[in-house]
Amino acid sequence: MILFGSILFGQTNFYLGADLSYVNEVEDAGAIYRYQKKKIDPYQLFAQKKCNLVRLRLWHQPSHSSYSNLADVTKSIQRAKKQGMQVLLDFHYSDTWADPEKQYIPKAWSEISDLKILGDSIYQYTYKTLEHLFRLKLLPEIVQIGNETNSEILQPEGKHAEKINWERNAFLLNQGLLAVKDFNEKHQTNIQRMLHIAQPENALWWFEEAHQNGIENYEWIGLSYYPLWSKYTMEQLPEALSILKEKYQKEIMIVETAYPFTLTNIDKANNILNEKALLPEFPCSPEGQKKYMISLVNQAIKGGAKGVIYWEPAWVTSNAHTLWGRGSHWDNATFFDSSNQNEALPVFDFFNPKNYLFQTN
């Protein structure tokens, strides 16, 4: 059965989402968002435009920022739920960015040498976080156990595991997955679990090795897909998604992607997506950005995926500081034009289900 232009989750099982982790911080640092020249709450705007899933990163005890900790994430979940959007909570299991290049252990756990105690730390932290949100009636619909865990998790600061010790890695990841399972059983809830790998070519080998080492109890495979860092073209993407879906019998979601609408840098913070991120078929323009997103969603649907999330579409320039400078490293790839008072851009139309043909199960 094909449904045209419908996205009610539960009928078509498709998410069109946004990672809004930076919103609280940039608003506190002076950012104002506009739609048709009028000030607007960004959460209200995303919901109004039919965004149905908000992704939020959670750091353990960040020392470089007072955001993306549990208090900040709790506030963000409240904002998302108030607007009727579902939530994907992204546990980084780190005090800072966890990604393919670094998976640094939280400082509070850094002296733990006993693997069982370390695993229990993941379990208790995950479980207690969900208990906190449960008491506030703010449970996420999906929980991500780790962020871009291409390499081995919980490594000493400054070190990168060149080769994954799967006995250790599988035990630790399974403890996070088990915490969600046990929480669901106790509270009769149905929080879904996701594992997340950057780039489809890496997911193909990583999930094979994970499966061989006993990591099986999860519902979602999450992928980052940035053409700048992937060997796969957009046209090749459906094949990889189909392989992952059929081989492991999991739902698939692209949880990170982005495309620039300009190469102009509005502030002194360098922009991560430069001319090397451009694709010939998608101009570096507001319409080109929109075309990229709609094309990507259609390819994701073709591959059997059940969702696409844009990474940090509201990380506009502000007086906020990052580890690398003041401003935004993403201002040319947001859904707002910082050179025009943060006016909303045409790419918001990517949330419009009328752009897609959704196939139901």
What residues fall within each predicted segment?
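Active-site cleft segment of glycoside hydrolase catalytic domains centered on the general acid/base Glu
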Residues: N69-D72, D99-Q212, E216-Y218, S230-E239, ...
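N-terminal substrate-binding region of glycoside hydrolase catalytic domains
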Residues: T12-Q86, S94-S121, G222
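Active-site beta-loop-alpha junctions enriched in small/polar residues
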Residues: S21-V23, W59-Q61, H92-T96, I145-N150, ...
